């Protein structure tokens, strides 16, 4: 088999995928991340086997400015605002350790959403957003979201004296073990007032907060996706971000959900690219390639081209509309979420298919847990569970777009 030019594969995708950053800030982030890739790759097998978040690498990232990547420059960060560039950065990390990329997404996502709160949020929430962003930019705050409930609903209640208390349990909170703050999705229940949704920001040192050491997932084992228990945690009123009404669809809110989650698509593109790289390296080592192998390789590359193109297109739309508050905000939300869900549906299906085919090409050696393809095989399947919609919810959303409610 003839070895291709080093420019061949990236060149085909240069105008259609996650290949190059679109902003100088995105380039600075990629340059920073390059220094971590060798260690990530070298440690990925042990981190997977032991289900361990590489705390020492995150500590380096905190000190060297990576964890402040999506914080505005005015507040001490790198100023990466492009969703395309964030997705590209996550793809590069995921090619070495997807669990670390998933954990890193937690911090990047919070920077993006808090930046929006700071610039466009209600006057009462802007000081909180600015304070958190400054701490992130200084390397003092590591913030992750806590969304998925365990056995019931996490509830924020307000007592007659005006104080708040948080009770409940969240699961699959990636990076929770090293976080300093948690943005918690809750129901807000107040006497004499309708139930609302809220997102209290809870510090790690808050009384009643317990971070469990219970992560033993099938894949993404280096993400540190543990449970958190809230047992009467006190929350100051000025640390609560208001959200919408439970059970009421608010299409304007789809924009924020898109900004928070769309960059994760880069993780699964990065996994598929890594699987291709491993498979082609093995095929070249063996020499020769039967027709069936060549057909499979061609199909892998065609699917990767489709993934790159779909994801880059959805990210371009999201970047274009993210700060456009000039028109119908519900229409803006739908215009951001719909291409995101088209791309997510394609990524969830075809990234899995690419990894499966790469495992088939490598053969039985890849079925051993010690082989990197085995880890990618497990990691790539996490995409179907990622926010904001799983497969069935995404299908419901897209079918409503096509057929109406």
From Swiss-Prot:
The cross-references to Gene3D superfamilies, in alphabetical order and at most eight, read: Acyl-CoA dehydrogenase/oxidase, N-terminal domain, Butyryl-CoA Dehydrogenase, subunit A, domain 2, Butyryl-CoA Dehydrogenase, subunit A, domain 3
This protein's pathway reads: Antibiotic biosynthesis
A GO biological process held by the record: antibiotic biosynthetic process
Does Disulfide bond show up as a keyword for this record? no
Q: Which SUPFAM superfamilies match?
A: Acyl-CoA dehydrogenase C-terminal domain-like (SSF47203), Acyl-CoA dehydrogenase NM domain-like (SSF56645)
Q: Which cofactor does it need?
A: FAD
Pfam families from the xrefs? Acyl-CoA_dh_1, Acyl-CoA_dh_M, Acyl-CoA_dh_N
GO molecular function terms here? acyl-CoA dehydrogenase activity; flavin adenine dinucleotide binding; monooxygenase activity
Q: Which InterPro entries match?
A: Acyl-CoA_Oxase/DH_mid-dom, Acyl-CoA_Oxase/DH_mid-dom_sf, AcylCo_DH-like_C, AcylCo_DH/oxidase_C, AcylCoA_DH/ox_N, AcylCoA_DH/ox_N_sf, AcylCoA_DH/oxidase_NM_dom_sf
> Which family is this sequence assigned to?
Belongs to the acyl-CoA dehydrogenase family.
Would you tell me the protein name for this molecule? Amino sugar nitrososynthase DnmZ
**Upper lineage:** Bacteria, Bacillati, Actinomycetota, Actinomycetes, Kitasatosporales
């Amino acid at each position: 088999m003839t070895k291709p030019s080093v420019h061949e594969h990236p060149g085909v995708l240069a105008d259609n995928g996650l290949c190059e950053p679109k902003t100088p800030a995105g380039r600075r982030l990629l340059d920073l991340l390059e220094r971590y890739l060798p260690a990530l790759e070298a440690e990925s097998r042990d981190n997977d086997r032991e289900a361990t978040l590489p705390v020492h690498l995150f500590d380096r990232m905190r000190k060297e400015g990576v964890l402040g990547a999506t914080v505005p420059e005015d507040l001490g960060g790198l100023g990466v605002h492009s969703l395309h560039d964030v997705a590209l950065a996550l793809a590069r990390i995921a090619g070495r350790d997807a669990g670390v990329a998933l954990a890193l997404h937690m911090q990047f996502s919070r920077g993006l959403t808090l930046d929006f709160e700071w610039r466009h949020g209600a006057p009462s929430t802007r000081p909180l957003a600015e304070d958190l962003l400054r701490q992130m930019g200084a390397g003092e705050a590591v913030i992750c979201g806590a969304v998925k409930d365990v056995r019931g609903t996490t509830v924020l209640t307000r007592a007659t004296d005006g104080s708040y208390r948080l009770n409940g349990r969240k699961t699959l909170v990636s990076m929770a073990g090293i976080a300093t703050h948690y943005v918690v999705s809750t129901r807000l229940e107040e006497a004499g007032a309708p139930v609302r949704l809220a997102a209290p920001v809870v510090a790690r040192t808050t009384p009643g907060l317990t971070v469990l050491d219970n992560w033993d997932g099938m894949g993404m084992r280096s993400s540190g996706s543990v449970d958190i228990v809230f047992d009467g945690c006190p929350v100051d009123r000025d640390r609560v971000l208001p959200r919408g009404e439970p059970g009421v669809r608010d299409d304007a809110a789809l924009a924020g959900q898109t900004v928070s989650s769309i960059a994760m698509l880069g993780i699964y593109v990065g996994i598929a690219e890594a699987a291709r790289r491993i498979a082609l390296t093995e095929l070249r080592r063996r020499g020769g390639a039967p027709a069936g192998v060549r057909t499979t390789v061609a199909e892998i590359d065609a699917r990767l081209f489709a993934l790159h193109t779909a994801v880059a297109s959805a990210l371009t739309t999201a970047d274009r509309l993210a700060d456009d508050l000039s028109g119908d905000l519900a229409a803006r939300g739908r215009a951001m979420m719909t291409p995101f869900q088209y791309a997510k549906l394609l990524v969830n299906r075809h990234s899995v298919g690419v990894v499966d085919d790469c495992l088939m090409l490598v053969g039985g050696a890849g079925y051993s847990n010690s082989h990197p393809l085995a880890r990618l095989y497990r990691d790539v399947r996490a995409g179907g569970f990622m926010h904001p919609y799983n497969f069935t919810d995404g299908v419901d959303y897209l079918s409503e777009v096509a057929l109406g409610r």
